[in-house]
Amino acid sequence: GCDKTEGFIKITHAASINDTFWIKSEHENVSWERISFYRNPFDETISKMAFEGMGLYGIKMSETSPELSTDGSFRKCWMREDNGQIFLYKRGSDGARNAGLEPYCEVMASEVAQRILGQDAIPYQLVRLHGELASKCPLFTNETYGYVPISRFPINHSSPESLMRFYAELGSETLFRKMIVLDSLTFNVDRHAGNHGVLVENDTQKPIRMAPVFYLNLSMLPYIEISDWEHIGTKMRDYGPRIGEDFTRIGQQAMTSEIRAILIGMKSFQFSFRG
């Protein structure tokens, strides 16, 4: 099974949907063509169970189940559509009385992101899958370009200055600044070191540029209740960014004349999403 490292590697070959690395034993008769997530249909049973949050103990695992190597605490699954394009479906939380709003928040924050970052923002849409509400977005990696999260690089992941220097060396300073401003405007509390990073050439691991901006489901204050708005200024003291210490201050520090002009052009902005 996959409950131990040896079993996980034997079944998955340590393949992920982020890159093209994989491993096999010296005498194992298996090829990339057989285990590649980019070339093979996904296991629909495992996909459905991962999305529904059901345990996989006792289930016969499949080599082509990208859910087994996908990070994140929210229930999610990958699906390939008829045209071959791969999408991630991500559910909201449940349990609390104000739970489950994360897909709505991700879609709304995505609209803001599209205005600020354009094609450098991954688009999200609201859908239902297996009877449950979810956000849906396209995969942005392929067999040529992979994704490496910033957590893999030896820098201070919470320091705006360190991150700015890092991305500037890749020619992506403006994109990083726009991401920070977006997170400030949408109160994104989850821009941790796994939720932004670098596109690399899979064959050489050469860094190309900052990856497009994604993962917005904890933007837009999904857990704020109606009563909180009566003292929202005080309530906001409970919230802060992962990069920097204060949403307003870090947004101001990241601002440029170019970004300011974009925001001024959004003065009449309205969400097209209506639920």
Features from the language model and the residues they span:
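Phosphate/dinucleotide-binding and metal-coordinating scaffold of catalytic cores
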Residues: 1-181, 185-187, 199-275
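Conserved protein-kinase catalytic-loop segment immediately C-terminal to the catalytic Asp
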Residues: 192, 197-200
